[in-house]
């Protein structure tokens, strides 16, 4: 039995037909056995060929005399170039500098094969590493990454020489696969007909990996279950399900080899697994997640009456650990001041993203997928930011400052020029939205290089979601009503917001005033988009300008009533030296009308302090107007 039959590859005759089709596709320039970048019709090649410093002009496939293998090699690069996966720089520079060694190796080792899939990947990679080492070529490279402890650590990886061959061979393992994507042990979401809401485009998670199962039966069971879960769950969550179930069934295979089917499971095996989890030193919330995934599998098997189901209840409510109430992981002002003082050292787009997330507190996926045209402007010239909430599957609008709106406008102009075909405000080179890891990585690289530390002197580790916690915590600490914070952050339930409801002793009234002046007076407050996307909606404008306000004859008091009654607000109405006449009657009537409007809103929202303050103003105005008109 040859290697390809073991790996579920199509027959040799089918491979020959596919290779014939490849040759038909590669016409004109692509039919040549030597690719000259100066003659390549691909747009990225035309641009790159203008570079006077370009040293690698040719890719010479004629070094491989085996015609079958040569066609596969050419098509491998042709496919990646013409499907937008790679550009000319990748082919002629990044891979072009290492390709000759691979071509010579293939010509030497496999002169007679009719497809690269005749050779097992593991065998070819071992032989190639030996080949390179004997010729003094490095097979590994050292990269550096910032760890979770904010330490710079060297990481060994395969060199480009090695990865080039590995990518080539894996491409044809997939290209010649005999079956559907679901039949593979690695599911690539790019090859699955998944709806957009199942895939978060800001994550690098492209695959669900079922390799590594010690028991083939349990692997097939988990694959079937994961395919079912993809009907309702996100791709990333199903990937986690596959990993956790693999851990459980491998534990079972190592400790209880006699258990070969689900119906053979008892509490003995489950309790042993629970003990294993508790000895791993992981958080209670993580343990809860793993138990929940396992219970989800068992309950599904029972409800849907699969052939192999648990013979009894295996998991009970008391198996779940008690989870401590989570505290928001906010970023201390001490750290934020350092971050903001070094924004100029970040790439322009990362600095802009940092300013936006500090003000709006959106989730990282929402920040990365902001689109061109996300700014809305009302009749007063104030701005709102519209974005899509991946978690809640809905659009959301929050008011933003004119300063941040200007940054967004500048960014939009730049992106429209550089990436006219991309819909995103922060696109990658291929036009897709920026990945979350890029944003986190740049911030933590900055923290390491600029020595951004916490109060204990340790280099600070930035987590993107901490900006959201910071906005929520700051709003609650400064007296913002919880339901308003809930609206601003786009939380589905009050429970999601209540985690921010803790107060710090160092909160001062002047800081509170400064906070509200920014988020209420200048930025306004949160408003949900109505069906017509009208930011000039009356209720929206009331939220923007009047939450926690007191009416004055010529405007509104900017000191929130929730911070305590202001002794100066409408002081003339209570002053014994105050006097007025009929000539001021229109102003009094206008102020009364505005006060009544604000009072109605306050009563409707049950804002008791605002009701008390504005009721007093209303009574005094009615007395004055009554006297003037009586």
From Swiss-Prot:
Transmembrane helix keyword on record: no
Residue positions of the active site: 363, 391, 465, 468, 491, 500 (o-(3'-phospho-dna)-tyrosine intermediate)
Listed GO biological process terms: DNA integration; DNA recombination
Domain Tyr recombinase: 326-513
Domain Core-binding (CB) residue range list: 216-302
Keywords: DNA integration, DNA recombination, DNA-binding, Transposable element
Domain of life: Bacteria
Key word DNA repair present: no
GO MF annotations in UniProt: DNA binding
Signal peptide limits: none
Protein task: One of three proteins encoded by transposon Tn554 required for its transposition.
PANTHER family recorded: PHAGE INTEGRASE-RELATED (PTHR30349)
Family indicated by similarity: Belongs to the 'phage' integrase family.
Identification of the protein by name: Transposase B from transposon Tn554
